[in-house]
Amino acid sequence: MASKEFHIVAETGIHARPATLLVQTASKFTSEITLEYKGKSVNLKSIMGVMSLGVGQGADVTISAEGADADDAIATIAETMTKEGLAE
């Protein structure tokens, strides 16, 4: 299992466009990938799940992956979040 914490810096938080991008990125992997915020954990491959968290600017979230490609999944998601200016 691999996981990484992120601090959301995007002014609008994880709204529709970045949520869609994260779901598309996560869906490329076979691992089970979750997004945790305020004690609630959702499937990062589910747009409805991600949107239901209402993650805003300044939030701290944890993304975890379990499976054969877990390390690659976390690395790719981290790269996407940083590149898109979503998190640091």
UniProtKB/Swiss-Prot annotation:
<keyword id="KW-0813">Transport</keyword>
<feature type="active site" description="Pros-phosphohistidine intermediate">
    <location>
        <position position="15"/>
    </location>
</feature>
<keyword id="KW-0598">Phosphotransferase system</keyword>
<comment type="similarity">
    <text>Belongs to the HPr family.</text>
</comment>
<dbReference type="GO" id="GO:0009401">
    <property type="term" value="P:phosphoenolpyruvate-dependent sugar phosphotransferase system"/>
</dbReference>
<keyword id="KW-0805">Transcription regulation</keyword>
<protein>
    <recommendedName>
        <fullName>Phosphocarrier protein HPr</fullName>
    </recommendedName>
</protein>
<comment type="function">
    <text>P-Ser-HPr interacts with the catabolite control protein A (CcpA), forming a complex that binds to DNA at the catabolite response elements cre, operator sites preceding a large number of catabolite-regulated genes. Thus, P-Ser-HPr is a corepressor in carbon catabolite repression (CCR), a mechanism that allows bacteria to coordinate and optimize the utilization of available carbon sources. P-Ser-HPr also plays a role in inducer exclusion, in which it probably interacts with several non-PTS permeases and inhibits their transport activity.</text>
</comment>
<dbReference type="Pfam" id="PF00381">
    <property type="entry name" value="PTS-HPr"/>
</dbReference>
<feature type="modified residue" description="Phosphoserine; by HPrK/P">
    <location>
        <position position="46"/>
    </location>
</feature>
<dbReference type="InterPro" id="IPR001020">
    <property type="entry name" value="PTS_HPr_His_P_site"/>
</dbReference>
<dbReference type="InterPro" id="IPR050399">
    <property type="entry name" value="HPr"/>
</dbReference>
<keyword id="KW-0804">Transcription</keyword>
<dbReference type="GO" id="GO:0005737">
    <property type="term" value="C:cytoplasm"/>
</dbReference>
<feature type="domain" description="HPr">
    <location>
        <begin position="1"/>
        <end position="88"/>
    </location>
</feature>
<keyword id="KW-0597">Phosphoprotein</keyword>
<keyword id="KW-0963">Cytoplasm</keyword>
<dbReference type="InterPro" id="IPR000032">
    <property type="entry name" value="HPr-like"/>
</dbReference>
<dbReference type="InterPro" id="IPR002114">
    <property type="entry name" value="PTS_HPr_Ser_P_site"/>
</dbReference>
<dbReference type="InterPro" id="IPR035895">
    <property type="entry name" value="HPr-like_sf"/>
</dbReference>
<keyword id="KW-0762">Sugar transport</keyword>
<comment type="function">
    <text>General (non sugar-specific) component of the phosphoenolpyruvate-dependent sugar phosphotransferase system (sugar PTS). This major carbohydrate active-transport system catalyzes the phosphorylation of incoming sugar substrates concomitantly with their translocation across the cell membrane. The phosphoryl group from phosphoenolpyruvate (PEP) is transferred to the phosphoryl carrier protein HPr by enzyme I. Phospho-HPr then transfers it to the PTS EIIA domain.</text>
</comment>
